[in-house]
């Protein structure tokens, strides 16, 4: 598919990810990346849990955050649910990490749900960065509360 065949105009939206009323977001340096000047963790939280949907890869070999977020939205065929927060890290993709990566993604949902005050299934997780390295869960234990305080 060639994107040039579509007549789509993309416009920047003032306010970024929090342009929609009722959403807060914070980005911090949590330590996923070595450079302390680079933000590497973000938390997006609606004022109250809200309907959410996701579109995910159909690749059988998808990363742990994709598998966990898909499950939290009701599985591969449903793709929608109630969302109370989105946890995003950069510097480590948590991909090709097997059961350890899945456990980390699930524990990230647990940590975020305790901080936000919701069910773990209401948290989505996303990771980008180096593939094949184990993501340190202890970084989330400090990052999530710090980002929540910064909202």
Residue spans for each PLM region:
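Short, ordered loop/turn segments at secondary-structure junctions
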Residues: 48, 91-93, 128-130
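Short beta-strand segments
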Residues: 44-45, 87-89, 125-127
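Alpha-helical support elements that line or immediately flank enzyme active sites
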Residues: 87-116
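Short acidic, glycine/serine/threonine-rich loops at helix termini
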Residues: 55, 98-101, 134-140
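Glycine-rich, mobile lid/loop segments that gate access to catalytic sites or pores
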Residues: 106-107, 111-151
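N-terminal amphipathic/basic leader segments beginning at the initiator methionine
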Residues: 1-57, 61
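Short coil/turn connectors at secondary-structure junctions
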Residues: 37-40, 62-63, 78-85, 118-122
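Glycine-rich oxoanion-binding loops at beta->alpha junctions
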Residues: 50-79
